[in-house]
């Protein structure tokens, strides 16, 4: 039976250590600082998946590493490849729980969407991620491991492709797992490791205003996206429970603080739900809402991926999206209709995991 705990009882991944933590651990166990640098190089540049592959590390120290850590804690369960090059992965954690990761081919390179929690408690009424409530947070090693396994998938193909961008937009609310997400960001951004540029990394939040303020003061130069999805409190509270705790006034005060502190642009994610939030009046409300920060904000209009459990929602027709877009553009709003990826596979975030868990339960019943 899967353990439902934020402190799982299994050997940690070495990916959970920052470079400084790995150096401290090596010194504590009788090695020199350079030994940690060698291990770091094996992990993130040579991208080995076992300590035994580290040929310049002594057998005794490899035994110590094996005693205390694993390299990658994830097991690949399912891989779905789309005709457009999108790849969706279902990974199994050491405690048997399942998470999703998505690789998207963009014109600028390979972008990976990572998951930060097992399940989600935010409660957006249109989203597949919240079909299963939060079981636990992922530790930063389990988040990093997603990137490493996706990169391994492409390394084995011998095409020389490299993960160049990361979006922290998978299952879960990243700012509800703040400490682990922050360590993950610093690990993948480390110049001595994967060296993924901060401006190639985007973190998305449903709107935890106090965490947006905290994030503004961290000094990390990654991009921030806010899942907005509605232009007024009444509508947003009806489809996003988080708005009852952090209404738009509080959220936008935090966003303004973030922009003033970092001088960085904020992206607003807006899923187009037919007959719900997609009228020209809604578009005008959105334009008015973002007017004060227009120069440093951007709106992503997102086609909805239908979820069978949320059949009260459907995708806005193309003409409604175009009319909405036109109102925004007339008001000087920087906006784009997001390109779709993986429409021929379990495309909605959380859908592959949900469908697999259903099949697993059905098999278990048959086997009784």
UniProtKB/Swiss-Prot annotation:
EC code(s) of this entry: 2.1.1.192
An MF annotation (GO) of this entry: tRNA binding
Catalytic activity: adenosine(2503) in 23S rRNA + 2 reduced [2Fe-2S]-[ferredoxin] + 2 S-adenosyl-L-methionine = 2-methyladenosine(2503) in 23S rRNA + 5'-deoxyadenosine + L-methionine + 2 oxidized [2Fe-2S]-[ferredoxin] + S-adenosyl-L-homocysteine; adenosine(37) in tRNA + 2 reduced [2Fe-2S]-[ferredoxin] + 2 S-adenosyl-L-methionine = 2-methyladenosine(37) in tRNA + 5'-deoxyadenosine + L-methionine + 2 oxidized [2Fe-2S]-[ferredoxin] + S-adenosyl-L-homocysteine
Domain spans labelled Radical SAM core: 106-344
Keyword tRNA processing annotated: yes
Binding-site list for S-adenosyl-L-methionine: 172-173, 204, 227-229, 305
Cofactor remark: Binds 1 [4Fe-4S] cluster. The cluster is coordinated with 3 cysteines and an exchangeable S-adenosyl-L-methionine.
Source organism, top-level taxon: Bacteria
Main location: cytoplasm
Required co-factors: [4Fe-4S] cluster
GO cellular component, one term: cytoplasm
SS bonds (residue pairs): 113-349
A biological-process GO annotation: tRNA methylation
Catalytic site positions: 100 (proton acceptor), 349 (s-methylcysteine intermediate)
PROSITE patterns per record: RADICAL_SAM
Entry keyword set: 4Fe-4S, Cytoplasm, Disulfide bond, Iron, Iron-sulfur, Metal-binding, Methyltransferase, rRNA processing, S-adenosyl-L-methionine, Transferase, tRNA processing
Compartments reported by the entry: Cytoplasm
Residues binding [4Fe-4S] cluster, per UniProt: 120, 124, 127
Summary of the function given for this chain in its UniProt record: Specifically methylates position 2 of adenine 2503 in 23S rRNA and position 2 of adenine 37 in tRNAs.
Note: Reaction proceeds by a ping-pong mechanism involving intermediate methylation of a conserved cysteine residue.
Family as reported in the entry's similarity comment: Belongs to the radical SAM superfamily. RlmN family.
Protein name stated in the entry: Probable dual-specificity RNA methyltransferase RlmN
Source organism of this protein record: Streptococcus agalactiae serotype III (strain NEM316)
């Amino acid at each position: 039976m899967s353990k439902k705990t934020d402190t799982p009882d299994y050997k940690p991944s070495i990916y959970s250590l920052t470079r400084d933590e790995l150096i401290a651990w090596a010194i504590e166990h009788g090695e020199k600082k350079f030994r940690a640098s060698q291990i770091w190089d094996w992990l993130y540049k040579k991208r080995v998946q076992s300590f035994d592959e580290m040929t310049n590390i002594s057998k005794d120290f490899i035994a110590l590493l094996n005693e205390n850590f694993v390299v990658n804690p994830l097991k690949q369960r399912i891989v779905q490849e789309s005709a457009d090059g999108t790849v969706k992965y279902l990974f199994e954690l050491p405690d048997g729980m399942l998470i999703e990761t998505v690789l998207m081919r963009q014109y600028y390179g390979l972008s990976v969407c990572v998951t930060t929690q097992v399940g989600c408690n935010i409660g957006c009424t249109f989203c597949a991620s919240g079909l299963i409530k939060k079981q636990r947070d992922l530790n930063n090693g389990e988040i990093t491991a997603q990137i490493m396994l996706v990169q391994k998938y492409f390394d084995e193909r011998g095409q020389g492709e490299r993960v160049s961008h990361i979006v922290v937009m998978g299952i879960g609310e990243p700012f509800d797992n703040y400490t682990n997400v922050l360590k993950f960001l610093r690990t993948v951004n480390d110049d001595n490791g994967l060296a993924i540029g901060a401006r190639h990394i985007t973190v998305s939040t449903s709107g935890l205003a106090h965490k947006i303020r905290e994030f503004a003061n961290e000094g990390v130069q990654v991009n921030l996206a806010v899942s907005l999805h509605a232009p007024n409190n009444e509508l947003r509270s009806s489809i996003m429970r988080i708005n009852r705790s952090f209404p738009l006034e509080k959220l936008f005060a935090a966003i303004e603080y973030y922009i003033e502190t970092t001088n960085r642009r904020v992206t607003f994610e807006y899923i187009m739900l037919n007959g719900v939030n997609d009228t020209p009046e809604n578009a005008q409300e959105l334009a008015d809402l973002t007017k004060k920060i227009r120069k440093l904000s951007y709106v992503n209009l997102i086609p909805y991926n239908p979820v069978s459990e949320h059949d009260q929602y459907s995708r806005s027709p193309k003409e409604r999206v175009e009319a909405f877009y036109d109102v925004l553009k007339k008001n000087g709003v920087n906006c784009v209709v997001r390109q779709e990826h993986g429409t021929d596979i379990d495309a909605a975030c959380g859908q592959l995991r949900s469908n697999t868990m259903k099949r697993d339960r059905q098999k278990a019943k048959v086997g009784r």
